[in-house]
């Protein structure tokens, strides 16, 4: 989801991200609902649904799983609905360590004529952030904010907005400082509960 927003220059902390969030997950849910009905017509409803008079093939249809490993295999896409933790980081494997760079940021840096090792070294040193790059506009910096730079209320807000379109649950991670005040931490959890989230991770 975050990769999609970055590709289209949409900050995660924006009304447009809310619009696309609802549009995407409503589209998925509507199509899954239709597929369940179509398969029920073709092969019969599942026993649980049939017992209650519903013509549905599936009783549970959608969930958002943690997809950290899959996102790396898919060329560095953002993991599920989770924001990207860093625009540049070192990925360690059994084969060795290698630098992973945000592919949409690469294109933006090329546009500015700044896709250099020096710039990438600065991004890596700055915990994957682009906030120190004075040649980027405020919009561009907002588009490429890392998970730790984002106001976590937006993660809760977006998660709550997509909840009606998910039949099971979402894997939602929050990115907070180790020294976060307990009052703020309680507020985040309370806001998540008020928005109808079933769970939070880490």
Sequence positions of predicted segments:
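Short, compositionally biased low-complexity segments
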Residues: 1-13, 81, 130-136
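Generic secondary-structure signature for well-ordered alpha-helical cores
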Residues: 3-6, 10, 26-45, 107-115, ...
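Internal maturation/activation junctions in enzymes
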Residues: 5-67, 138-141
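Catalytic alpha/beta core of large soluble enzyme barrels
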Residues: 62-202
């Amino acid at each position: 989801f975050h990769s999609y927003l970055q590709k289209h220059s949409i900050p995660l902390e924006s009304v447009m991200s809310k619009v696309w969030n609802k549009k995407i997950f409503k589209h998925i849910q509507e199509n899954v609902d239709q597929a369940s009905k179509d398969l029920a017509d073709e092969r019969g409803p599942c026993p649980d649904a049939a017992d209650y008079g519903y013509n549905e093939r599936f009783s549970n249809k959608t969930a958002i799983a943690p997809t950290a490993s899959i996102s790396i295999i898919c060329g560095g896409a953002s993991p599920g609905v989770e924001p990207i933790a860093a625009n540049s980081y070192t990925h360690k494997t059994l084969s060795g360590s290698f630098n992973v760079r945000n592919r949409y940021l690469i294109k933006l840096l090329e546009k500015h004529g700044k896709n250099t090792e020096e710039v990438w070294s600065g991004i890596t040193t700055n915990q994957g952030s682009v906030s120190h790059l004075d040649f980027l506009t405020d919009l561009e910096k907002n588009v490429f904010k890392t998970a730790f730079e984002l106001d976590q209320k937006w993660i809760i807000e977006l998660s709550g907005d997509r909840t009606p379109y998910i039949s099971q649950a979402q894997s939602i991670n929050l990115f907070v400082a180790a020294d976060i005040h307990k009052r703020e931490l309680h507020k985040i959890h309370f806001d998540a509960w008020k928005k109808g989230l079933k769970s939070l991770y880490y």
